[in-house]
Curated annotation (Swiss-Prot):
The active site is at H20. One of its GO terms (molecular function) is D-ribose pyranase activity. Pfam families: RbsD_FucU. Catalyzes the interconversion of beta-pyran and beta-furan forms of D-ribose. Keywords: Carbohydrate metabolism, Cytoplasm, Isomerase. It comes from the Bacteria. It comes from Pseudomonas syringae pv. syringae (strain B728a). This is D-ribose pyranase. It catalyses: beta-D-ribopyranose = beta-D-ribofuranose. The gene is rbsD. Gene3D superfamilies: RbsD-like domain. The keyword Acetylation does not apply. Substrate binds at D28, H101, Y123, S124, N125. Belongs to the RbsD / FucU family. RbsD subfamily.
Length: 134
């Protein structure tokens, strides 16, 4: 059995397969997933699992070089934003970039995989760009 927090087989496989610059998205329950992009659907019910819990576990295994958020997130200020801001202060998410929600949907077409959570707070979505550990 693995010693690290992440137990989900599909998610563990995707993170292990990421190369430098690959995109992994963590999204709320309402974010559309483009055809052809792998979906890891963790959603069980509204709020389960929440965005913050999934982000925390993903970061335990993924080296992040940068991340992309929707401008609308800054306007709505879901709880996930405060956590992301704290992680930025700890330099766990690399450089931050803001784009429109519509542009984030376009960017999702380039994702290696999208992790769907049960989060129902609007605009609780992030595109994580994989870095390297060396």
């Amino acid at each position: 059995m693995k010693k690290t927090p992440l137990l989900n087989i599909a998610l563990s496989r995707v993170i292990a397969s990421l190369g430098h610059g690959d995109i992994l998205m963590i999204v709320d329950a309402g974010m559309p997933v483009p055809a052809g992009v792998e979906l890891i659907d963790l959603a069980l019910t509204r709020g389960v699992p929440d965005f913050i819990s999934v982000l925390d576990v993903v970061l335990s295994e993924m080296q992040v070089e940068s991340h992309v958020l929707a401008n609308e997130m800054a306007e709505v200020k879901p709880p996930a934003l405060q956590v992301i801001e704290s992680l930025n202060l700890e330099d766990q998410l690399g450089q931050q970039r803001w784009i429109s929600h519509e542009d984030l949907k376009v960017l999702s077409r380039k994702a290696k995989a999208i992790i769907r959570t049960g989060e129902c707070q609007p605009y609780s979505n992030v595109a994580l760009v994989s870095g390297v550990v060396f």
